[in-house]
Amino acid sequence: MVGQRAQHSPVSLLLLIHLCLLHLRASGQPHPTPEAPVEEVVSVQGVRGGSVELACGSGPAPLLVLWSFTPLGSLVPRPVAVTDGAMSKVEAIASALGVVSLRNSSLVLGELHEGARGHFLCQVLHVAGGQLHAAYSHLTLAVLVPVSKPQVRLSNPSPVEGASVVATCAVREGTEPVTFAWQHRAPRGLGEALVGVTEPLFQLDPVNRTHLGWYMCSASNSVNRLSSDGAFLDVIYGPDKPVITMEPLGLTEEGFWASEREEVTLSCLAASNPPSHYVWLRDHTQVHTGPTYVIARAGRVHTGLYTCLARNSYLDTRTQTTVQLTIYYPPEGQPSCAVHPSPEAVTLLCAWPGGLPPAQLQWEGPQGPGPTAPSNVTWSHAAAQLPSGSVFTCTGQHPALAPPALCTVMLWEPLGRPTCWSTATMGDQFIMLSCEWPGGEPPATLGWLDEQQQPLGGSSSSMAVHLLQAQEDLAGREFTCRGTHLLRTPDPHCHLQLEAPQLDVAEPRVSVLEGGEAWLECSLRGGTPPAQLLWLGPQQQKVDPGTSGFMLHPEGAQLRLGIYDADPAHHRGTYQCVARNAVGNSSQSVLLEVLRYPAPPNVTISRLTYGRHRREVQLQWAILGPGNLTGFLVQRKASALGPGAGAWETAASDIEPESRGRRLGGLDPGVLYAFRILALNHHTAGHPSEVKIPADPPFSAYPAVLGAAGTGMVVATVASLLVFQYAARHPETFPRLETPTTTPGLDPAQETTDSPVNVTITVTATP
């Protein structure tokens, strides 16, 4: 009965019962039911901001569930929520715990607050065996707080190397126990854990440059684990003593070396924080600022002491390092090889002076390497042990040159034999004996010998020259040139015999027609030294290449003389071909005859008359007798009868031989001219014709009369027509003498009228 009433009682009754139960429970009095209530104690954990469900034990369906909360440190319970299964009520004070709701008999706390930390009591009324029973559940709720994001604090973020630094990992909140861990990461490295450091703070004493970098800490508890952002520990240090490096690298005992004309890069590094400021000095003079000094094209002037100054601007500390830089340069050009022969041995010389350091030279021959020395090296060999074609190489090595420089000598004997010749010098005052034997290494030695095999002067290499005073008694004498070479036995030689020149002419007598072309030929036969050929004209004058009317044409040992447009007055006569050398001369004569062409026939003028206005004449002529001709020549002059008589001048030339007439213009009407004509056979002119003066053309009246008559007839005809026209229009002007009779059968229109008409026609003839 009690259970049924309880199920149907209002909430106010429930709360009243609840309060009673709380009162009884709080007062420690026993439950009014005959049996003691069942109690359960449970510990529950929740996370702040999270959700937790508090269960109210297990058993039969409750009639009433009452939840209360007692904060830590308090003895007074506070009602939280009540439900009878149909209705539920959450007290306003429950918001301090979070978002409170009931799920059946369980109390659900969402968005858990730290204020929910304490003791929860669940009281349940239920019916069992027809009796009302009360059950109690005690729950202790622990609210856990996650650790907050830790923060690293450094006692000195920028300490000087050697000082003391304390690092602290600060956490604002978090349920104990909280565990700490530390990590260090260099600026250009990976992070590494600091083993053994688990406290919220640790000390670096003394601090050094290896401690520079980022420091991070992490904090963790039973709820979570968070890591801090990095805090940078900037350790101030340096600068250390600078270290100088060079590219490309070349090391010497004093420092570095570099090749001339290459790019050289000097780098300076001094460990420092903040980074060092660098200054470069060359021989105590500043040349650059910055860690790298580049010499774009190294030269010899760049040799010297280079100092790198490093400065820490924060600490105002300085360090420096000095090195020696030497610019190497090879000797100029290439090694030079030379051979100095002697009768029984050969000396090989190799020289390559200059350079820094001096080049190292070494000989190498067919049997292997030879001596070595700087700048120059000498090697001697017995001539008997050296076959022709032996090759010797001198190798020059220098640090500034990648490939070695070489010079090579190949010993070989010259080909063939010596060649001898002679020439005259200084106007044939001296005779130069020359001897040549080219090729060979070393070159052959040559010397001249007289007829008694006595040396003439000294000897020389490859070519020997000896001068003799020119005189006639040298003709017929023989000289010998002897050559010697260490690889050639016996000694070869050549002979030279001096002799006067001899001449031959193709034809001693040459004929040519006037105006033609003639060639005189002269050939040189023998002569040592070589002779000079020339031609002398009929007046013994020398014919030069530029002489007018002549042409010289040398062909080997011949000298041809050409005569153009032969003229008897200038070209006829005896020509001499002369050959001269330093030991004698000779000459040959050639007679040149210039023949005239036969005379052409005579010419007579058949007609010579003036043209219009006396400014031209018409000339006609005729040939008298047989003969060859090639043209005509017309001449004129002012007649002696006129005011200005003068010499004959050409009026027309180049007239074809077939022509028999010519119109000549360009006359002055005020001058009286005389004309004559000549026949031409090439350059031969015939006898002039008779001299004639132009005549006026004859008068002809017949054409004038005919012209006048024709003109009169035209005028008469025109006048008659005019008279007839006038009479027809004015008949009264002309009276009739009698009346005409009419003939029967005659048409009036056919009547004739014999009216006389007088017409006067005047004809004037002008001659």
UniProtKB/Swiss-Prot annotation:
Q: Which residues cross the membrane?
A: 704-724
Instruction: Show the coiled coil region(s).
Output: none
What are the protein's UniProt keywords? Disulfide bond, Glycoprotein, Immunoglobulin domain, Membrane, Repeat, Signal, Transmembrane, Transmembrane helix
Q: Mind telling me which GO cellular component terms the entry cites? A: cell-cell junction; plasma membrane
Polar residues: bias regions: 739-754
Could you mention a single GO BP entry for this protein?
cell-cell adhesion
User: According to the UniProt record, where is the region Disordered?
Assistant: 735-754
Cellular compartment(s): Membrane
Protein name (record): V-set and immunoglobulin domain-containing protein 10-like 2
